[in-house]
Amino acid sequence: MLTLRSYMAADEDAAIELWRRTWQKTYPELDFDARLPWWRERWRTILVPNSDIVVAADDGVLLGLMTVDPRNRYLDQVVVAPEAWGSGVAEKLLGEAKRISPSGLDIFVNKDNFRAIRFYEKHGFSFGGEDVNPISGRPVNKMSWRS
């Protein structure tokens, strides 16, 4: 049975592996194994201390996670295991993000991640312009949801 709960330090390895697996499936041409040291450092020093993190688990197996910084409404990550795509996990995690930040959310979505763009549009996010992700350098769409 799927449960949502707050992230715990013991989830770190599973959360990082979930991120790697999911992004590798989304962008198979990129080497996410090579990015793991960078991601682990970012996870530990930026996301964990500054974000509310919710994980979705089924029988102890992480199927998704969401990070939102309540200070600036920035939804940094919604990650769902490829085998759980289309199962409602992303909707539940996004619902938690909206509960944590009821006044609104902002996110950068890679311009070529059409699946994610459709998902956010379906859930009330609107296009706010084009930009470049300051971390990856990839072109992104700024998207926002307001209550």
Q: Positions of the model-derived regions?
A:
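Conserved active-site alpha-helix within GNAT-family acetyltransferase domains
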Residues: 91-92, 112-129, 135-137
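Conserved N-terminal entry element of GNAT/NAT acetyltransferase domains
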Residues: 1-10, 145
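Short hydrophobic/aromatic beta-strand or adjacent loop that forms the aromatic wall/cage
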Residues: 51, 137-143
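Acetyl-CoA-dependent GNAT
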Residues: 6-83, 94-96, 100
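Active-site acidic-Proline motif in GNAT/NAT acetyltransferases
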Residues: 81-87, 111-112
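Conserved GNAT acetyl-CoA-binding A-motif
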Residues: 100-112
